[in-house]
Every structure is written in C-alpha cells, then in structure tokens.
Amino acid sequence: IFLLPFVQSSMGKTDFIREVLAKNDGFAAEGSGTTGGAAAVEGNVFRVTNRQEFIAALGNRKNTEPRILMIYGTIDFDTDADGKRLTKEDYMAEGYDFQQYLESHAPHSTAPQSRKEEQEEKIKQSQKNQEKNIMVHVPANTSIIGIEHAKLKGVDLVLDADNVIIRNVMFESPYDYFPSWDPNDGPDGSWNSQYDSVTIRGGTHIWIDHCHFEDGTQPTETYFHREYEHRDGLVDIVNQADNITMSYNIFERHNKAILIGNSDAKTADDGKLNVTLHHNYF
C-alpha cells in the first residue's frame, strides 16, 4: 500500500522520477513549492546501487544543479570504498576500551578522573569515525527515488538545503556502535546514541513520501540498569527547518520516530518548523 511498485503504476518510470509535489499539498507546497530534481538533464539522472555511487551522484553539497538518484536494491552505508562491511572494530579509535568506559562511568566509580576523560575522548573519536562514513549531506534540488527494492541501510541523510524530494525508499536506521552514558538524562541516567535516518537540519521545501522507516535487528543489552540504546531517531526536523510535507510513510518498530524542534530555548525556530504530516502510519 505504501511503497509504489512501478509495474502497477499508471505512469511510467520517467514520469514518476520527475513528479513534483502538488499544489496545496502541505507546507512544502508553500512559496516556490517542492520540485526536487525534476528539472535534471539526462546527465544528472543516476542509477545508484552502492554507497560509492550514491555519494558520487550527489556530488558537492554546494552544487545546486538539479539531480535525480534512482535507487536499486539495498545500499549499506557501513561499508568502505570497496564494499567491505565495516564493524565496530573498524571505527574504534586507538585506545578505546569499553570495559574501561563502563568502569569509569559507573555510579560511585572509584576510577581515576583521567581514565574517564580519556575514554570520553576515545568514544567521541570513534563516533566521528563512524559519522564520516554514514552521514551524507544532500544538496539542493535533489530527488532520491526508490525504483526496485530500494533500501538505504545505516545512513544519516542530512537535509540542510532547499528543495529535496525522497520517495519510495525503505530506511533501516543507523546503528551507533558507540552509545554514550549521560548520568543526568532522566532520574536514573540514560544511554544516548547519535544519527537518524533523515536529519532535516535547516532544510526547506522537503517532501518525504511513500517511505518506510524502521530499525534493524539488534541485541538487547543493559548497563547500569538502562537499555544500551544503539539507535536514535528516524526523522529529526530541527535548526529552523521549514516547509516540510511527510505523506504516506510507515514508521515501524521504533520508539522515537519523529522529532520536530529540539529545544524550547531556540528562539530562531520561532515561525519556522512548519510541518505537514498526512496519511502516515505509525
């Protein structure tokens, strides 16, 4: 019902990949509307099957030439340039030791402060190593369209530009290998992870339609009597993002699906964060 099989579509593939948001279809239709890469010349229409092709097709994040990415199959972003699967060990900063991290952050820990600070620094570097691989900025005037069994696995798409369309794509949320402990998060502290499937960070005129967002499988782990959270949100809309329409999407098997605004103190968000949600299934 939610993903669009082209063999059953009344319009051809060429028409579908260039489809724009209809007038009056929510806040993303305001002003100039949302057209994504509909005006792309044929040389800027890309068939994408892996991470390297995806990044190459997007090009420079400041490039505003319209472009369309047609996604085929599963693209795993926890992979290197040769397609090799990357794991925790590949991202881990030298000197990071999870047991030392636990011991130095445990309630009433007697570990030296220097060890705690060292492991804090190592986990931040490890997170940055993973971030470099999975966080991808989408330039303005881009359409990302799923064509055949399209799935983006473990990516954090950052939308900080204007005029982006994402349709017919399944997202498996990023798996943060290095959750960090915050003793002040709630009465008992909490484990916090980074990365969302889509982060609309100041982006404007964004249309996300007929997509499916969910977590992958993961072990259930508990430390300090709190779940060791490997996954953050599915879609975050923050930092003066505006004129967003999300339609006919599925949000499944996740407890932090959509965040709209991330601080009451951000006065710059006043008048922004205009979002339309319709026909989504949670």
Question: Across the structure, where does each feature detected by a protein language model lie?
Answer:
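Active-site-proximal loop/turn and secondary-structure-junction residues that shape catalytic pockets
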Residues: I75, A257, N262-D264
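Short consensus segments that form the blades of beta-propeller domains
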Residues: N133, P187-G189, F224-E227, K266-G271
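Acidic Gly/Asp/Thr-rich repetitive segments characteristic of extracellular carbohydrate-active
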Residues: K23-M70
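Bacterial N-terminal signal peptides
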Residues: I1-P5
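Right-handed parallel beta-helix
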Residues: A140-N141, I145-E148, D162-Y175, D196, ...
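Extracellular beta-strand-rich solenoid/capping regions of secreted or surface-exposed proteins
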Residues: A56-E65, D78-S143, K151-N168, S173-T204
